Amino acid sequence: MNLMQFSGLLVVWLLSTLFIATLTWFEFRRVRFNFNVFFSLLFLLTFFFGFPLTSVLVFRFDVGVAPPEILLQALLSAACFYGVYYVTYKTRLRKRVVDVTRKPLFTMNRVETHLTWVILMGIALVSVGIFFMHNGFLLFRLHSYSQIFSSEVSGVALKRFFYFFIPAMLVVYFLRQDSKAWLFFLVSTVAFGLLTYMIVGGTRANIIIAFAIFLFIGIIRGWISLWMLAAAGVLGIVGMFWLALKRYGLNVSGDEAFYTFLYLTRDTFSPWENLALLLQNYHNIDFQGLAPIVRDFYVFIPTWLWPGRPSIVLNSANYFTWEVLNNHSGLAISPTLIGSLVVMGGALFIPLGAIVVGLIIKWFDWLYELGNREPNRYKAAILHSFCFGAIFNMIVLAREGLDSFVSRVVFFLVVFGASLLVAKLLFWLFDSAGLIHKRTTSLPQAQVERKL
């Protein structure tokens, strides 16, 4: 890539970034936070943050990248996707009906709400405990990160339950919503994330998500400003780089450290070159249709329930890694949201996928607003916990693709819903046994004397 080609790409990148950032800023000024703001920032991070890092790698370290015309296609496809997404998100098919009393789908009381977060926390802690008993601290046992996906590690399915610690702590926060509860959420979830980082052998997802939710709650409540958010973002990038060095066992300094920082940061936060790599191999893709969405559910079905379950799950990430790139290193390469749509149906699926994603984010915002208007604080805490807990699934949506998102959000919905049902069942049993007593608020002595 020469300077003229880079200049052309830079113009497209600047215009695309300005387009998305401007729309996001207007939305932020209007509502301060909703899931459209979050997804827009996540989209910017995934598809545009990596371009400056790639440019430095090319001109400073002479790293090979996809041809400029392919990089241009990647930038334009991302900008067009966001345009279709935004129009879909903002389009209202029916008039908004205000102040209509509807029968609630469910209600929550104090005991049921506390039982729910205890059950969610129990699911996470028991899963971590069983995994630890089988494998110990994998971070200190394994020699390479890819080994955590090998047969040496048992109970891999348990890792899917670790994340439910975060929704549990979200319920605790939303019941109080003060600065102490906010800081407690950060300390508890990051500590749990560091524990799972050592046990699993280098998975940083729980730490990133806990920190991101902490920051967005701070923005919503006005406890942190935009410059503090930017400073925290820089701190987060440095922290993730340090954890990545520990995960891969790297000891670098000087130019090598700078080079390592650039490519690890790009791969961690902005795998946009994976989309370019996919577009470069467009002619090698045998479009999979909706099959990757169905196949991604296979990992949630235990072998004792389905003895003939395929050992290899050919979702869009694995198809891209194994079939398109012929890479069998043991690690799946993230195709990104747009890449997963290309694997499923080519360029035609990009605008269709943008429409689907727009409707998904619209639904999460509807649920979030429902929680904001809910007079029952216990039910509001559950609704908000579900919405913010699904942030992990939105990160999966942007990085891994639509197929991975669908399976994980269904799994999250099933476990979260089952926890609610169990909490309600336990409350009914305790109430039937006479163990539940209504709280009585005692009047101050002065009021008692007046009444007498």
Curated annotation (Swiss-Prot):
<keyword id="KW-0997">Cell inner membrane</keyword>
<feature type="transmembrane region" description="Helical">
    <location>
        <begin position="37"/>
        <end position="57"/>
    </location>
</feature>
<comment type="pathway">
    <text>Bacterial outer membrane biogenesis; enterobacterial common antigen biosynthesis.</text>
</comment>
<feature type="transmembrane region" description="Helical">
    <location>
        <begin position="181"/>
        <end position="201"/>
    </location>
</feature>
<feature type="transmembrane region" description="Helical">
    <location>
        <begin position="378"/>
        <end position="398"/>
    </location>
</feature>
<comment type="similarity">
    <text>Belongs to the WzyE family.</text>
</comment>
<feature type="transmembrane region" description="Helical">
    <location>
        <begin position="63"/>
        <end position="83"/>
    </location>
</feature>
<feature type="transmembrane region" description="Helical">
    <location>
        <begin position="410"/>
        <end position="430"/>
    </location>
</feature>
<feature type="transmembrane region" description="Helical">
    <location>
        <begin position="228"/>
        <end position="248"/>
    </location>
</feature>
<feature type="transmembrane region" description="Helical">
    <location>
        <begin position="155"/>
        <end position="175"/>
    </location>
</feature>
<dbReference type="GO" id="GO:0009246">
    <property type="term" value="P:enterobacterial common antigen biosynthetic process"/>
</dbReference>
<feature type="transmembrane region" description="Helical">
    <location>
        <begin position="6"/>
        <end position="26"/>
    </location>
</feature>
<keyword id="KW-1003">Cell membrane</keyword>
<comment type="function">
    <text>Probably involved in the polymerization of enterobacterial common antigen (ECA) trisaccharide repeat units.</text>
</comment>
<keyword id="KW-1133">Transmembrane helix</keyword>
<keyword id="KW-0812">Transmembrane</keyword>
<dbReference type="InterPro" id="IPR010691">
    <property type="entry name" value="WzyE"/>
</dbReference>
<dbReference type="Pfam" id="PF06899">
    <property type="entry name" value="WzyE"/>
</dbReference>
<keyword id="KW-0472">Membrane</keyword>
<dbReference type="GO" id="GO:0005886">
    <property type="term" value="C:plasma membrane"/>
</dbReference>
<protein>
    <recommendedName>
        <fullName>Probable ECA polymerase</fullName>
    </recommendedName>
</protein>
<feature type="transmembrane region" description="Helical">
    <location>
        <begin position="341"/>
        <end position="361"/>
    </location>
</feature>
<comment type="subunit">
    <text>Probably part of a complex composed of WzxE, WzyE and WzzE.</text>
</comment>
<feature type="transmembrane region" description="Helical">
    <location>
        <begin position="118"/>
        <end position="138"/>
    </location>
</feature>
<feature type="transmembrane region" description="Helical">
    <location>
        <begin position="207"/>
        <end position="227"/>
    </location>
</feature>
